[in-house]
């Protein structure tokens, strides 16, 4: 997937400077995502910090690449790029925490896949570390952080709605 994104960037009409910055961002975030996926294969964490660090690498890194590369392509300033990083970080963590919650609260029909798979694989999740209510609170905190980061952008209504949908999704 990253190779296709890189080819698309190289074939674009963007300046060489923007292409270089975007390829570097894609490269750095792809390495982080691969590291997160590798760490996730063990699936056991003693602390919430360790779990969230893996979630950052596994999910937030990829969202960061997309968000930052969009900003670079649009010619955004450093303030907006920083806000995009903050948004992607928080929305990625919220997404993963909601995924943990759905694994114990959803149905096969709603989720479209077997539920309880994390427990069957003996994976540590935000729910196993915090309990369901605290995991929901943490997902809400990260969702609010993501929405706050979006305040740096004009016409952010769509992304705010999307962020809320991610928190309240059923699958």
Predicted regions and their residues:
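Mg2+-dependent prenyl diphosphate-binding active-site environment of isoprenoid biosynthetic enzymes
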Residues: 1-149, 153-167
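Short cytosolic juxtamembrane segments of multi-pass membrane proteins
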Residues: 170-171
């Amino acid at each position: 997937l990253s190779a296709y994104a890189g080819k698309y960037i190289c074939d674009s009409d963007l300046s060489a400077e923007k292409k270089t910055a975007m390829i570097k961002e894609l490269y750095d975030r792809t390495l982080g995502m691969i590291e997160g996926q590798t760490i996730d294969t063990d699936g056991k964490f003693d602390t919430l910090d360790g779990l969230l660090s893996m979630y950052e690498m596994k999910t937030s890194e990829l969202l960061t690449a997309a968000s930052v590369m969009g900003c670079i392509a649009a010619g955004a300033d450093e303030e907006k790029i920083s806000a995009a990083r903050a948004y992607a970080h928080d929305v990625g963590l919220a997404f993963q925490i909601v995924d943990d919650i759905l694994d114990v609260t959803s149905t096969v029909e709603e989720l479209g896949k077997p539920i309880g798979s994390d427990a069957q694989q003996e994976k540590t999740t935000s729910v196993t570390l915090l309990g369901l209510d605290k995991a929901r609170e943490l997902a809400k905190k990260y969702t609010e952080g993501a929405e706050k980061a979006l305040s740096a952008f004009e016409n952010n209504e769509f992304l705010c709605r999307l962020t809320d949908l991610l928190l309240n999704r059923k699958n």
